[in-house]
């Protein structure tokens, strides 16, 4: 830790215990990436290669292949590698020369050409993967508020019925920076105590630490359902490095390094007690310890992103969650969740090296 006046600067390390996905909003359809397998290419494992559009089109023009490529894009064939090698007579080295990056396909695609659209991970202007500090702060916010709510014995209103959302101002908007014309402190994000907590973006993540991962939903009885979805993810075991700064001129010791870690552990305990206990571990589930962990990024599920259950308790939280999910996903029959005692009634898993991992789980270390 470094002290700079009222600032306390810590090294924050998140170790991916499962595939982590933070989407850029971009995606690649089947005809926009090259799928390589050891059977057909000189690679050690299944691999996906993303092309640099500018370099690729220069190559097509140089080899006078633009008409063939147009026919390919309009036709039924979807295997870009086979098209480029068999019909365009390009070598693997030719293709690599116009690629942006390659990542391991892992368990997400197979040699049977079950090609899927790939959701891309966020990258910086230099093309390298990174984790935005705002994503980590959002995960810590959930842990902090879960801890504070569970420590608050005052009665809580059923916000799930009013549709007004969680009253975070009660817990967070405690500063006096913005007031109305009468001098009353406003319930406004400008007054959030979390202004005193900042997290840098992560150091860049190498493409060798990236994999493709699909999505598998698991029911309370352990039954699984594969979803036709594919994401660029950070590989389990990867360490992500950030700087976390606490401004005690704002926080006044309300949030400290010790209290942050306590909040993380409180969230873990509540997650296991209120949510995970309703589920039988599916077949091939990896052995996971929920100790000093956070759920980071996309695809981690409703419970990890919301405060419905800690605020309302399990009984009222169940009904509020059903109401909220019914409004957002009318076709999913969330009224049936009541019979399972939990809503939503699925846990989101990623398949990696033959085992199922809960999406986004990261171990937290502060030093």
Where are these regions (language model features)?
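Basic, Gly/Ser/Thr-rich N-terminal segments that form RNA-phosphate-binding interfaces in CRISPR RAMP
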Residues: 1-367
